[in-house]
Amino acid sequence: MSELVKISKTQFENVFQCEFNDGTVRLCTKNLAPGFSVYGERLFKVEGVEYREWNAFRSKLGGAILKGLKQNPIVKGTKVLYLGAASGTTPSHVSDIVELEGKVYGVEFSPRVVREFLLVAQHRPNLFPILADARFPQYYRTLVEDVDVLYVDIAQPDETDIAIYNAKFFLKNGGYMMMAIKARSIDVTKEPTEIYEMEVNKLKENNFDVIQVIQLDPYDKDHAMVLAKYKGK
């Protein structure tokens, strides 16, 4: 197995680069819950600090960073609403990035998956699992404060509409949305690039300035990450 030889900072706060003796380079984050691995990722201790390897093939945010994300609005102290938290793989890295000064509210619809997410959250005081349907934000509005970033990863045909609706409830004016679009969940008959353009236009029509659209191949086939800034309700 390859051994870690160097950890260095990236352009993004609290996102690091791990270099190994076989020449490979991976992303990593400081582990907010030392000793605990979330999805089988490797842990490394350097000068008393534990880091977690961040597998971009398991995380669309990790893939977007490696594919040239220009700006990561998720930093120390950020409050994030995460729709489609699943079992907590990417939310756990977001939890590392925002540290204890930030908060990550993770909405997931599947009770079975939420049980796994709860096991992750019990070691992370800044991670708040919510069992709910993201189509109905009014049911969790009392649980979530206004947030700086809305992160959306729900493989539904109406994902963009759900994202916009949640933004109206929770996203601060001037806040950011990061949305992972799965083209095949929206329309299997159209080319992915055509679908990305359609969904981006919906955002523009609903008070978002679209900053960047990143195709996530090879990390996620027929997926794109959209970064947009919210101009307000």
UniProtKB/Swiss-Prot annotation:
Binding, S-adenosyl-L-methionine: 89-90, 108-109, 133-134, 153-156
Keyword Transferase: yes
Lineage: superkingdom: Archaea
Keyword Transmembrane on entry: no
PROSITE patterns: FIBRILLARIN
SMART domains for the chain: Fibrillarin
SUPFAM superfamilies: S-adenosyl-L-methionine-dependent methyltransferases
Protein keywords: Methyltransferase, RNA-binding, rRNA processing, Transferase, tRNA processing
InterPro entries assigned: Fibrillarin, Fibrillarin_CS, SAM-dependent_MTases_sf
Enzyme Commission number, as recorded: 2.1.1.-
GO biological process: box C/D sno(s)RNA 3'-end processing; tRNA processing
GO terms of molecular function: histone H2AQ104 methyltransferase activity; RNA binding; rRNA methyltransferase activity
Family in the record: Belongs to the methyltransferase superfamily. Fibrillarin family.
Subunit-structure text: Interacts with nop5. Component of box C/D small ribonucleoprotein (sRNP) particles that contain rpl7ae, FlpA and nop5, plus a guide RNA.
Function, in words: Involved in pre-rRNA and tRNA processing. Utilizes the methyl donor S-adenosyl-L-methionine to catalyze the site-specific 2'-hydroxyl methylation of ribose moieties in rRNA and tRNA. Site specificity is provided by a guide RNA that base pairs with the substrate. Methylation occurs at a characteristic distance from the sequence involved in base pairing with the guide RNA.
Protein name per the record: Fibrillarin-like rRNA/tRNA 2'-O-methyltransferase
Organism: Sulfurisphaera tokodaii (strain DSM 16993 / JCM 10545 / NBRC 100140 / 7) (Sulfolobus tokodaii)
Upper classification of the organism: Archaea, Thermoproteota, Thermoprotei, Sulfolobales, Sulfolobaceae
